[in-house]
C-alpha cells in the first residue's frame, strides 16, 4: 500500500486537512502518517529514515504534504525520496502580490492560543455540561440547541461544533413518553424556539445504531424507530423547527449544513 505523510514543524493540521481533502478525490488506498512538531534537525533525520523505509516497503515513493516554516528542515524532508507538495509555497507568492505585503511565516500561529481558542474551550465545557438535557437552567447561554430522538448524532455534532468553531451547543432528547403524542415542544424549550435545530435520519440507520447498543430491545426495534422518527418529523414541521436528515452525512458535513442554515458566528481563527 502506498504511503501518505503529513509533516510540519507545527501541528501538521493544515497539511493533514489539505492532504486528506485532496486524496479523498482519488479511488486509491493509502497508509496515512501524520508527523507534527518536526522542529529540529534530529527529528527531521528520523523522519527521513521513516520516509525511506516507506519507499522500501511499498516500492513506490510516498506522497508528502508538508507545511514548514524552517527552510532547512523543509529542504531535508524534500530530499528523502518522496513526492512533496508544499501548500504554503504554492499560495504565498500570489497572495503577497495581491496584498502588497511580504509574508512573515511563524510556527504555531495558525493553531496557537488566542482569543478564539478560549471561545472553543468554553464551548467544549458548555457542550459537556449541557449534553442530553442535563442543565435546563443554562439554555439561555446556548448559541444552538440540537433536538432529536435518541442516537441521532446530537452529542457528537454538539462537540464538533464546539471544538471546531467555538459554538455553545446544548442538546435535548425527545422521547416518545413525554413529547411525541402531544406533538408540541417540551415546555422547557418553547422560549428558546429560535435556537432550536432538529436532527433526524432513516429508520433503518437508527435501527442499526440502536441495535449496537441494545440489540433485540423494543427501543431498537424497527417499528419503534419508524414511530419515533415519523412523530418527531411531524413535530419539526408543525413547530417550524429547521432540521436535516443526517443518514448519509459525516459529523463534519452535518455541522457544515447546520452552520449554512443558521448563519451562526464561527470562532475558529
Curated annotation (Swiss-Prot):
Extract the NCBIfam families matched here.
Answer: PRK05339.1
Q: According to its UniProt record, which protein family does this protein belong to?
A: Belongs to the pyruvate, phosphate/water dikinase regulatory protein family. PSRP subfamily.
Where does the signal peptide begin and end? none
| Annotated protein name in UniProt | Putative phosphoenolpyruvate synthase regulatory protein
Keyword Ribosomal protein appears in the UniProt entry: no
What class does this enzyme belong to in the EC scheme?
transferase
Function summary: Bifunctional serine/threonine kinase and phosphorylase involved in the regulation of the phosphoenolpyruvate synthase (PEPS) by catalyzing its phosphorylation/dephosphorylation.
